[in-house]
Amino acid sequence: MFIDEDYVNIVPQDLLERGIRLREEYGIYDIAWRFDDVMEVLKIAKSKDMVIVGGDVYRLSGNKPIITYDSWSIKEGDDGDDAFELAVRYITNYRARNGDDFAYCPAIGPYTILQEPNEQTEK
């Protein structure tokens, strides 16, 4: 999985700056984004053949993230397109039910993480 430092090479600087870093608050080397920004991050990840294997939701108090313990994840056998659609659907539904005071931290990695270990070495 990518960590916060990896996003420098993935998303534009302005999008990176709007992200909420989780390192200081929770010791997690990752970034959460508000709804519109996370949707952009997901589109960028898909366009770069990356996969979203799941993610976590944080409630925002001001700009401070608070763990909700809500999350989503793909199932064994899901492909990259399924993972993207699941993330979009989960986040969109979560926002519709709970409002805008949330940030979403997608777990993004290279597409190869969906392959079996022997498939990765055969290439």
What kind of feature is each model-predicted range?
Residues 81-122:
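Amphipathic alpha-helical binding modules
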Residues 27-28, 32-41, 77:
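Structured alpha/beta or helical-core interaction and ligand-binding surfaces enriched in interleaved
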Residues 35-40, 62-69, 111-121:
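Short, solvent-exposed polar/charged micro-motifs at secondary-structure junctions
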Residues 21, 39-47:
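N-terminal domain-onset segments
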Residues 28-33, 50-62, 96-111:
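Short glycine-rich, low-complexity/disordered patches
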Residues 47-92, 96:
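Acidic, low-complexity, intrinsically disordered interaction modules
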Residues 1-33:
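Long, contiguous N-terminal structural blocks used for assembly/anchoring
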